[in-house]
């Protein structure tokens, strides 16, 4: 049995999340509340929302937790060549927070193999847009020829970044945005990006699962660090990857 949270109720301890043998490993609580304040409290405790349309807000603390360390971002020989073309071609841009809400809509509406529907409802868009206005949520956008062709969004607290979703309307467009984000965060001393749940795609990019206890210990320290300001960069940060020795 999971807890139902009224608006002012605290989250239960994360060790009360459903275990690996349950139908929903990591499920901790449910609520009707997706306020910006509730989201900030959740992220500081290593908890994230994820639910289907028509369900209450479901709160999760998975064990293990999928993370991506910026220095572990995987750059193949082919993708390194792509990044060099992006750097050399002025029609390619990386924009930050230029169209935050539109990025969320793109993440919600872009078709994905094996996925039907989206959890990024209008209520979710409104909640994260409110976080964006307060300086906590950011988008990293790949533009080509004046068109937004890929991107991602997430939440930044101190020296912690919590990735939420990404989309691509062109091959590698979201991966280019992630490469830029990893280069920027790595240069600012950010050691970990929360990717929430393990997938083959995230693993192919360098993500790896870590025990929940280790993840939470890192979050407690990193999320309380001073905020990264200014939150701004451009495609020049991609040189971090094109200058490195090639990886398989």
Curated annotation (Swiss-Prot):
This is Leucyl/phenylalanyl-tRNA--protein transferase. Pfam families: Leu_Phe_trans. One of its GO terms (molecular function) is leucyl-tRNA--protein transferase activity. Disulfide bonds: none annotated. Functions in the N-end rule pathway of protein degradation where it conjugates Leu, Phe and, less efficiently, Met from aminoacyl-tRNAs to the N-termini of proteins containing an N-terminal arginine or lysine. Belongs to the L/F-transferase family. It catalyses: N-terminal L-lysyl-[protein] + L-leucyl-tRNA(Leu) = N-terminal L-leucyl-L-lysyl-[protein] + tRNA(Leu) + H(+); N-terminal L-arginyl-[protein] + L-leucyl-tRNA(Leu) = N-terminal L-leucyl-L-arginyl-[protein] + tRNA(Leu) + H(+); L-phenylalanyl-tRNA(Phe) + an N-terminal L-alpha-aminoacyl-[protein] = an N-terminal L-phenylalanyl-L-alpha-aminoacyl-[protein] + tRNA(Phe). The keyword Ribonucleoprotein does not apply. PANTHER family: LEUCYL/PHENYLALANYL-TRNA--PROTEIN TRANSFERASE, LEUCYL_PHENYLALANYL-TRNA--PROTEIN TRANSFERASE. It comes from Ralstonia nicotianae (strain ATCC BAA-1114 / GMI1000). Its EC number is 2.3.2.6. One of its GO terms (biological process) is protein catabolic process.
């Amino acid at each position: 049995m999971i807890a139902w949270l009224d608006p002012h109720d605290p989250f239960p301890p994360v060790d009360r999340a459903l275990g690996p043998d349950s139908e929903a490993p990591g499920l901790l609580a449910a609520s009707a509340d997706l306020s910006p304040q509730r989201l900030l409290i959740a992220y500081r405790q290593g908890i994230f929302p994820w639910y289907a349309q028509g369900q209450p807000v479901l709160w999760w603390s998975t064990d293990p937790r999928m993370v991506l360390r910026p220095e572990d971002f995987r750059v193949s020989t082919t993708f390194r060549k792509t990044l060099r073309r992006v750097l050399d071609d002025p029609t390619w841009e990386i924009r930050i927070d230029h169209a935050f809400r539109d990025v969320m809509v793109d993440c919600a509406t872009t078709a994905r193999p094996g996925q039907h529907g989206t959890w990024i409802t209008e209520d979710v868009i409104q909640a994260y847009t409110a976080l964006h206005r307060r300086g906590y949520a950011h988008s990293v956008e790949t533009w080509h020829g004046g068109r937004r062709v890929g991107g991602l969004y997430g939440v930044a607290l101190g020296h912690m970044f919590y990735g939420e979703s990404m989309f691509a309307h062109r091959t590698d467009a979201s991966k280019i945005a992630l490469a830029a984000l990893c280069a920027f965060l790595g240069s600012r001393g950010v050691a970990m990006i929360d990717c929430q749940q393990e997938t083959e795609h995230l693993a192919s990019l360098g993500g790896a699962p870590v025990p929940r206890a280790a993840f939470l210990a890192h979050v407690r320290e990193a999320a309380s660090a001073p905020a990264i300001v200014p939150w701004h960069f451009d495609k020049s940060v991609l040189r971090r990857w094109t200058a490195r020795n090639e990886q398989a």
